Amino acid sequence: GLVAWLERPKNPTAGGWKVRVADQEINGIHGLLKGDVDGDGKVDLLANSAQPVGAFPNSGAWLKVPKKPRKAKSWERHIFARNDAPGLSHYLGIGDVNGDGRADIAMGAKGGPSDASGMGEWFYWWEASNDPPKPFTRHKLPGKHPGATCIQQAEGNGDGKVDFIATRGHGLGVIWFEAPTWKVHDINPDLEFPHCLQVVDMDEDGDIDAATCAYGSQIAAWFENDGKGNFKTHIVAKEQ
């Protein structure tokens, strides 16, 4: 595997961008996310190490940005989920779930025929330790979720608690988990292979909406939140 960043030249349209390597040992990188993991005000990188082989099998990692990223041969690697993310994990979410001021991390794992472990089809979140270089504590979200891929922290129903919005990108449906019991609610149960997810206030009414592209259904859609966790599907385009 390879995690790298591309340095933009002064004129971004003239010639190539410089490739800077951050890590070469994480294996099976399907998701890459930026976020401040250790609370130092600087953006770090997060990646999954989804393959069951290699130096960090079935794991999740974050990479601390060095003081001189242009000169560093690699970034300082920390494993937040060591061997406890089996089942072909996909994408990551970052945000303070439990209100302790630290950045927690979430992932989904698709499972399915290519998952030799038979331990996928889940959404987990990892509670940040009080010393972020140390491993985080894993928490399982309810249910079995064939094809689980995307998950992001978001306040879904206006109660001030951080919830999760998620998609089963190799399966069916867009859902959200309601804190603190993580009750599962359907946003759209019928979309096939919604393999991406964005959470944002689309209509600028003060609550968080969601958007996805479902390549099985060949639909791009966004989901309007009424502020109480009830979502209405709006089709942006078909045959996509």
Feature-to-residue mapping (PLM):
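Beta-propeller-forming repeat regions
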Residues: G1-Q240
